[in-house]
Amino acid sequence: MKRLVLLFIAFSLFLCANAQIRSSFYGCKLGVTTKKQVLDNLKQLGHKIQYDKENNCYYIENVTFAGERWNLCQFEFYKDTLALVGFGLLSDNEDVVDLYNRNLENVKTKYSEIEGKMTSDNQNRKLCYFDDGIVVLSIGYKIEEGN
C-alpha cells in the first residue's frame, strides 16, 4: 500500500498581545496585509498563484522556507486580511517524520519561552502548536494509507 504523508507548518493569526513569532512572509504581514496586496506581491515576485475552491485558499508551489523545500505555500484570509500562511509537503515515505522532528526542535530552540502544546500525538498524525498571543505557529504531519 502506498502511504501519503503530509507535513504542514502553518502560521495563523489570533488578535491578542505582542507577537514574538515571525509574522511576515514574502513581504506580507499577518493581520495587516490585504488579499489584493498579497496576490499582487506574489505576482511581482514571479509566483504563479492558484486558488483551491474546496479549501478556500490561495497557494503557490515549490517554495523554500526555513531552509527546506516545500510542495506548496498556502494563504488564507479573514475579512480580506492575511490570517494564515501554511507550508506543506507531500511524500510517499516517512522521511517527513524526520523533517517534522527537525522543524519542531528548531522552533522549540528559537521560541524557547513559548510552550508547545500537542493537539494530536500518535504514529500517523502529530500536531504541535506555539501561541504567543497573536501568532500561532503549528507544526504537524499526517500519514494516510492510500491505494
Question: Residue spans of the language-model regions?
Answer:
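Sec-dependent N-terminal signal peptides
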Residues: L4-L15
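Short amphipathic alpha-helical segments, especially helix-boundary/capping motifs
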Residues: C16, D80-L84
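Non-cytosolic coordination micro-motifs
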Residues: Q20-C57, L84-N147
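N-terminal, post-signal-peptide region of Sec/Tat-exported proteins
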Residues: L42-K79
